[in-house]
């Protein structure tokens, strides 16, 4: 497992470094769920997320909220070198239980794009409206995904 995490970190570094240096551009990393190995194609392990956070907070990157990236680009402003945004799709519960505490502790902004139908049906694998409000009130940005995904 440790070798896999290092492999992901090496790939992440190799992908981010040259692309994030382009003038007035940003790389957006997109996640779905965390610590849910039964969904390997969309899962990020806790160890992988910790490695990504360590890399993103190493001082080599400028992590910005997606709203700020878009606002600066729309204003014709140049983004800082190596700008990175973080996006999480769908609104799975593991965002609240695993990712948010780690990202918050690291001071990394991120945007969650919610598929509201799952929340309205009170799916046990998805965030609740109360959890969404709690995260929003703590500074997490939310965007629209769709109703039914």
Can you name each region flagged by the protein language model?
Residues 6-15:
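Bacterial N-terminal signal peptides
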């Amino acid at each position: 497992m440790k070798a896999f995490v290092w492999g992901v970190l090496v790939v992440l570094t190799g992908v981010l470094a040259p692309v994030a240096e382009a003038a007035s551009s940003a790389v957006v990393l997109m996640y779905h769920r965390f610590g849910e190995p039964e969904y390997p194609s969309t899962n990020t392990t806790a160890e992988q997320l910790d490695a990504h956070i360590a890399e993103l907070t190493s001082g080599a990157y400028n992590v910005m909220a997606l709203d700020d990236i878009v606002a600066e680009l729309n204003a014709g402003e140049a983004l800082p070198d190596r700008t990175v945004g973080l996006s999480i799709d769908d609104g799975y519960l593991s965002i609240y239980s695993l990712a948010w505490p780690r990202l918050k502790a690291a001071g990394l902004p991120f945007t969650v794009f919610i598929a509201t139908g799952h929340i309205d049906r009170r799916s046990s694998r998805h965030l609740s409206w109360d959890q969404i409000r709690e995260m929003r009130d703590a500074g997490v940005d939310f965007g629209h995904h769709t109703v039914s995904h």
